[in-house]
């Protein structure tokens, strides 16, 4: 059924990515959206696992030579916890000072993706509903989750909130013997 929306006389072929937002249901996966762009926050867990140069990949797409580029992926898992402003998604305050990040807006051991932030006079402030994507990778899913939530615990701002159930369904779905599985790096 998706094909009818993707193919037709008005379909414009582009050299880009195709992003699908999926939801698992008792009747199988369902598409809730698709776009010719990266998804947010989904991309935050993909990019840290990429081995190689993203700019080289984009250049190869532009030059129609993507088949010539070796694209590899790191072993392990990556998780992202979105920190949101109080009141999000309805009504939220902007301009709340944020604490716990270094002067580059990072936390040791994590990738901090700024979404609704503003940097002014050497300080970070909230400037939107979804404020940060706190992303960590590790050899195990539990390890990645632990690192993400540890980094979240270091970042403070009035009204902050975040989901505490990220990755829990995946942990339950993994075979029991895979929870402590560690991958060897080549």
Predicted regions and their residues:
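Short, structured loop/turn "capping" segments at alpha-beta junctions
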Residues: 16, 56-57, 89-90
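Single conserved hydrophobic/aromatic residue that forms the stacking wall/gate
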Residues: 1-8, 12-13
């Amino acid at each position: 059924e998706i094909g009818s929306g993707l193919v037709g006389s008005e379909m414009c072929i582009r050299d880009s990515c195709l992003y699908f937002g999926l939801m698992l249901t008792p009747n199988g996966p369902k598409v809730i959206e698709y776009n010719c762009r990266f998804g947010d926050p989904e991309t935050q867990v993909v990019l840290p696992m990429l081995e190689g140069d993203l700019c080289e990949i984009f250049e190869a797409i532009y030059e129609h030579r993507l088949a010539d580029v070796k694209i590899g992926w790191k072993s392990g898992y990556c998780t992202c916890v979105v920190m949101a402003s109080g009141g999000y998604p309805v009504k939220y305050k902007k301009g709340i000072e944020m604490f716990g990040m270094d002067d580059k807006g990072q936390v040791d051991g994590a990738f901090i993706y700024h979404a609704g932030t503003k940097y002014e006079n050497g300080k970070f402030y909230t400037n939107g509903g979804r404020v940060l994507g706190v992303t960590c990778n590790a050899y195990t899913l539990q390890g990645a989750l632990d690192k993400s939530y540890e980094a979240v615990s270091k970042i403070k701002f009035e009204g902050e909130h975040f989901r505490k159930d990220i990755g829990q369904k995946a942990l339950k779905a993994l075979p029991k013997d895979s929870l402590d599985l560690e991958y060897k790096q080549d």
